[in-house]
Regions:
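Glycine- and acidic
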Residues: 4-19, 56-69, 102-112, 168-181, ...
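C-terminal, non-catalytic "cap/extension" segments appended to globular domains
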Residues: 62, 91-101, 187, 195, ...
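Secondary-structure capping and boundary motifs in well-ordered enzyme cores
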Residues: 64-67, 116, 153, 157, ...
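Acidic/histidine-rich catalytic neighborhood
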Residues: 107-110, 120, 201-271
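Conserved helix-loop functional segments at active or binding sites
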Residues: 126, 130-137, 163, 193, ...
């Protein structure tokens, strides 16, 4: 998958071809697995009297069906943002058309300077401190007390995460730091989780865990703080444009892509319940239909891309989960917009939100901000922030 981010188009194309071949070789068993687990969920939902395939996840997330429907409708109504962005990317890459393996191609002017660990630490803590000295103070403890492990080492697992442990102790953070701008963002993201977990620990074992839709609030907000600090340091228009584009693609991955995946899941589960076992061709049809709705005609999605539904683990392990990413990202973008409007009064309310953990429902936790999760206008606030970023690079 890493080769899909390679600057060499031939490498990206070869990676896509190999990915398709690998999935195709396992097509029969993957189709069987998807059908079996979809049928298992259908039976469980029937026994538990859930009125729809998504109801169980909504109940787990402490959200009303209306709220989730409003979110999905808001995002799909703004797929035009995706269409406009990839027209920009095609122009910046100098291509006549974008194939699906060009989606993650790096822009030539993206800053490549390596950032050492000390500079990363200073950037993150400065960004946090400009927002809230308390937030920076907590994050500083992760560095000073060795609550964060960053070096790459033999036998160390990949990726990044924050683990809350138990309320009586403190969280730990793991990252694999290589010095890229993206890695600095990852450190900010995981420290956002760490700060959230540290503050929420006072709620104890039963209430410190945050409801899933709000679990990414602190992490994505922390990313935004650092992104704006990094952007301010770039002096070249080309570098600034490329850096904003990279951020837009990250947002697209959590807002629009996850929503399109939700649309695929709906077709799959409803199709399984209405028509019985689904063929691989039918699942690929569902996938291409929902992906093409998102990309429009700005990215060419050939039939070879049709099998790519079969590598998404969330469809199997946590049905209905993916909309939570879009929920969290748009919520943070809207909260950041409120911060820009309110300034200092916002900060105290925000830290109280983090410290509340899971002691109240999402609706109750967001009440101090005057947020109505059932209002289409609320979700449009976050989408408007995305559009404003897009306008800066068009």
């Amino acid at each position: 998958m890493n080769d899909l981010y390679n600057g060499d188009r031939a490498v990206r194309k070869n990676a896509a071809v190999e990915m398709t071949a690998g999935l195709t070789d396992n097509n029969h068993i993957l189709t069987h697995i998807f059908n079996t687990l979809a049928a298992d969920k259908m039976i469980t939902d029937r026994l538990r009297k859930h009125p729809s395939w998504i109801n169980a996840m909504n109940l787990h997330n402490e959200l009303q069906n209306k709220t989730v429907d409003t979110l999905i409708e808001a995002v799909t109504s703004r797929y035009d943002i995706v269409h406009r962005y990839y027209l920009v990317k095609r122009r910046l890459l100098g291509l006549d058309k974008l194939e699906h393996f060009d989606r993650y191609a790096p822009l030539p002017s993206l800053p490549t300077k390596e950032i050492d660990w000390r500079s990363c630490r200073e950037t993150v803590l400065r960004s946090f401190a400009e927002f809230s000295p308390r937030m920076a103070e907590i994050a500083e403890m992760f560095f000073a007390r060795n609550w964060i492990h960053a070096p790459i080492g033999e036998g160390k697992r990949g990726g990044a995460f924050a683990h809350p442990c138990v309320p009586e102790v403190h969280p730990y953070v793991l990252v694999n730091y290589t010095g890229s701008l993206r890695d600095v963002s990852t450190v900010a993201h995981e420290l956002g989780h760490g700060v959230h977990q540290f503050l929420a620990a006072a709620q104890g074992h039963f209430n410190s865990d945050t409801p899933l839709p709000l679990a990414e609030t602190a992490s994505v907000f922390a990313e935004l703080l650092v992104f704006n600090s990094q952007l301010a340091l770039l002096t070249s228009d080309e570098e600034r444009r490329a850096f904003i584009c990279q951020k837009l693609e990250s947002i697209f991955a959590t807002v629009f892509r996850q929503t399109a995946m939700n649309r695929f899941e709906q077709l799959m589960h409803e199709g399984r319940r209405s028509h019985g076992e689904l063929s691989s061709a039918k699942l690929s049809e569902y996938w291409l239909t929902t992906q093409r709705a998102m990309f429009g005609d700005t990215v060419q999605l050939g039939d070879d891309y049709g099998i790519w539904w079969s590598y998404i683990p969330h469809f199997l392990s946590t049905p209905g989960y993916v909309y939570s990413y879009a929920f969290g990202e748009l919520l943070v973008l809207a909260l950041y917009g409120l911060y820009r409007q309110e300034g200092e009064p916002f900060v105290a309310k925000y830290l109280e939100l983090l410290a509340a953990g899971g002691s109240r429902s999402p609706y109750e936790l967001l009440q101090p901000f005057g947020i109505d999760l059932d209002s289409p206008a609320f979700w449009q606030k976050g989408l408007t922030v995305i559009e404003e970023m897009l306008t800066r690079v068009e």
